[in-house]
């Protein structure tokens, strides 16, 4: 059973869930210690091609995959993913005509529709397979805390949503008492740049967030929808790191949202869950709407009945992006 991301993780105010935070804090110390030792003891090995890591400092929901897609498109690179949720250990090149999300994971299958994508639980083996297949550069989706591969460049993606008491790092505590994969200072010390990914309706990043990240170059990008939401009433659903972000984006774009159903990240939709959503939509004569990542996980018969709402990362200053990644 997969659990949904606790929303209180991303509340900057420690007054929310104080007992839970306190009880989980010793486990956070252990998690942080194990992560630090693993990184310190590792000896990264060369993959045979430059590797750009696009990673997270938090447990998910920052918008990393759209940034991976944009950088890989820009550089003509191959994407490397662990293939979370997939059954194949790899290395294997993803073929959308052959593979299903249950084999290679949802994000790799989604990206493979227009990019060369590899999945491998062994990141080094996957990067070397991509290099052997002719990859000029490998863009690694996630892996900032994975020290096995020598990285030419490490970018960390940070959620730029800071309204309504949200903060991308919560109160700074490490998993499971908070959203951090490791302490902020430790993660930033290994980064070459940070990407603040803003929601489409937020004009500029919080100056305090820019200041916190200022020890590395900071790039600004915006998560822009590829088109308006469908006309008419919609029942929307999402099983992503922060499903409430999808709901908020739809409302900001003017979607006539009659109901929103959140699911855990990478949720495997079955016929029963989808039938309930379809019944709810039928009550209001509504359409069914989801994210591109969720849509790729749907059983093929349901893809005709549900519309995806794709988004892409648009960088505010493309010259600044080229200055960071263009030398590879």
Curated annotation (Swiss-Prot):
One GO term in the molecular function aspect is: ATP binding
**Which family would the database say this protein is a member of?**
Belongs to the LpxK family.
Q: Please state the pathway this protein functions in, per its UniProt record.
A: Glycolipid biosynthesis; lipid IV(A) biosynthesis; lipid IV(A) from (3R)-3-hydroxytetradecanoyl-[acyl-carrier-protein] and UDP-N-acetyl-alpha-D-glucosamine: step 6/6
Signal peptide as annotated in the record: none
Known function: Transfers the gamma-phosphate of ATP to the 4'-position of a tetraacyldisaccharide 1-phosphate intermediate (termed DS-1-P) to form tetraacyldisaccharide 1,4'-bis-phosphate (lipid IVA).
Q: Which Pfam families match?
A: LpxK
Enzyme Commission code(s) on record: 2.7.1.130
Listed GO cellular component terms?
Answer: plasma membrane
Choose any GO biological process term that the UniProt entry carries and state it: lipid A biosynthetic process
Instruction: Tell me the InterPro entries matching this sequence.
Output: LpxK, P-loop_NTPase
> Which sequence ranges are marked TM in the entry?
none
State the UniProt keywords alphabetically. ATP-binding, Kinase, Lipid A biosynthesis, Lipid biosynthesis, Lipid metabolism, Nucleotide-binding, Transferase
Q: Which reaction is catalysed here?
A: a lipid A disaccharide + ATP = a lipid IVA + ADP + H(+)
What organism does the record attribute this protein to? Phenylobacterium zucineum (strain HLK1)
Q: What is this protein called?
A: Tetraacyldisaccharide 4'-kinase
List residues binding ATP.
58-65
């Amino acid at each position: 059973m997969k659990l949904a991301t606790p929303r209180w993780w991303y509340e900057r105010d420690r007054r929310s869930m104080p007992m839970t935070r306190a009880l989980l804090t010793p486990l956070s110390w252990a998690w942080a210690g194990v992560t630090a030792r693993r990184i310190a003891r590792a000896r990264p090995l060369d993959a045979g091609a430059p590797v750009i890591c696009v990673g997270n400092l938090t447990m998910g929901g920052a918008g990393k995959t759209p940034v991976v897609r944009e950088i890989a498109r820009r550089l003509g690179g191959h994407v490397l993913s662990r293939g979370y949720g997939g059954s194949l250990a790899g290395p294997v090149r993803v073929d959308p005509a052959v593979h299903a999300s249950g084999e290679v994971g949802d994000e790799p299958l989604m990206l493979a529709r227009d990019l060369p994508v590899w999945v491998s639980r062994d990141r080094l083996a996957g990067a070397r397979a991509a290099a052997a297949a002719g990859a000029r550069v490998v863009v690694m989706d996630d892996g900032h805390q994975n020290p096995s591969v020598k990285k030419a460049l490490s970018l960390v993606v940070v959620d730029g949503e800071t309204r309504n008491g949200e903060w991308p790092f919560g109160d700074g505590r490490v998993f499971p008492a908070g959203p951090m994969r490791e302490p902020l200072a430790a993660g930033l010390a290994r980064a070459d740049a940070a990407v603040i990914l803003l929601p489409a309706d937020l004009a500029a990043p919080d100056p305090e967030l820019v200041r916190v990240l200022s020890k590395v170059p900071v790039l600004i990008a915006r998560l822009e929808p590829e088109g308006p939401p469908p006309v008419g009433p919609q029942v929307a659903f999402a099983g992503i790191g922060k499903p409430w972000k999808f709901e908020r984006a739809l409302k900001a774009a003017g979607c006539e949202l009659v109901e929103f159903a959140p699911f855990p990240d990478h949720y495997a939709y079955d016929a029963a869950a989808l039938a309930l959503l379809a019944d709810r939509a039928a009550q209001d004569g509504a359409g069914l709407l989801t994210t591109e990542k969720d849509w790729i996980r749907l059983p093929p018969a349901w893809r005709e009945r549900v519309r995806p709402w794709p988004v892409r990362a648009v960088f505010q200053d493309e010259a600044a992006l080229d200055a960071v990644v263009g030398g590879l």
